[in-house]
């Protein structure tokens, strides 16, 4: 019985180290403060929700922003795009689907889908540069290959 447990445990460890991470879904509830006078979620909140989903994605992919920053690197936002399809309202439960869709040694691109009960509300993208804390571009693949591999394993 314990031998079987060890076999399964070892199999799960091997499997988890080889299985590609495929995105993450975060849930947010539209708060009253996030709505306008008409009760519709204000457009500026989507950027915040994208960040929530992106940081949840990074944690779920077992990438540590803290470790990346300890190495002296940061990933500032360089562009943000959002296409609104339908309105979101106060108390809506929104699912933010985040995935890493592009990776280069100096840049990351995340894509987002915002849904409510499976209905598409918005789509978006954010692009992030890879720079030192002094804001100098860095080739992470060359200078920190272990960090690059973590992002590569999370690539959709």
Task: List each language-model region with its residue ranges.
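Short hydrophobic targeting helices and cationic amphipathic motifs
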Residues: 3-6
């Amino acid at each position: 019985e314990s031998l079987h447990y060890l076999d399964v445990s070892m199999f799960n460890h091997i499997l988890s180290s080889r299985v590609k991470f495929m995105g993450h879904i975060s849930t947010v509830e539209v708060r009253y403060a996030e709505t306008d006078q008409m009760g519709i979620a204000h457009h500026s909140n989507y950027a915040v929700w994208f960040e929530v989903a992106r940081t949840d994605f990074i944690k779920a992919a077992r990438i540590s922003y803290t470790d990346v920053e300890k190495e002296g690197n940061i990933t500032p936002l360089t562009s943000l795009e959002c296409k609104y399809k339908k309105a979101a309202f106060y108390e809506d439960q929104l699912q933010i689907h985040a995935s890493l869709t592009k990776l280069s040694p100096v840049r990351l691109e995340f894509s987002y889908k915002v849904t409510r009960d499976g209905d598409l509300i918005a789509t978006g993208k954010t692009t992030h540069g890879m720079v030192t804390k002094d804001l100098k571009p860095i080739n992470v693949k060359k200078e920190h290959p272990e960090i690059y591999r973590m992002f590569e394993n999370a690539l959709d």
